[in-house]
Amino acid sequence: MSNLVSILGAGESGVGSAILAQKEGFDVWVSDSGQIKPQYKAELEKYGIAYEEGGHDVEKILSSVKIVKSPGIADTVPILKQAADQNIQIEGEIEFAAAYTNAVLIGITGTNGKTTTTLLTHHLLQKAGLKVGLAGNVGYSFAKQVAEENHEYYVLELSSFQLDGMHTVRLDYAVLLNITPDHLDRYDSFQGYIESKFRINNHQTSAQRFIYCADDEVIKNQLKNHNN
């Protein structure tokens, strides 16, 4: 049976995912359709992780038990559609890494203000003496920190693209700041973007917390029909 995890995209999240996958005992293959930046190539070589650039070895990737994709890669690209047709598990870095940590996870999203809010939250927790990591759409790779650090908390800035790659993650604290039209080149409609943002509290239990802006009209309207 295959033990191969293929990583699509060799940027910060992809290389971090590769390092974690290797640590967890998987065979790892990193594939990037473009050119890999020198610092990421050097990191892959440091860990002895196999990679390719300038294209995809489709046959090899489709032999994977799992594909971890970078957030900028849409689910509609041909290789991912082929993988989905073959029932290969496809997920993002956050989903992949969350399975290997017991830390408290704080996720923050919103069309505007999420970076500032994430940085401030991380700063406050750090000043309180907590062992906290900063990751997601800001800071260093979440997966690499899970592989090499031992943080008790993670503050994650989550874009809609990252949320789309999360299927089972239960955030201990999910924060939704606001929603205004954005990334409509990626989504079929504004409603699709709204639903992507609301993925932040999918799968939360009654012991976990969903914090949102009650003054945001889009959020208020979506809450009427939203089921956790």
What residue spans do the PLM features occupy?
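N-terminal leader/targeting and accessory segments in enzymes
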Residues: 1-92, 96, 217
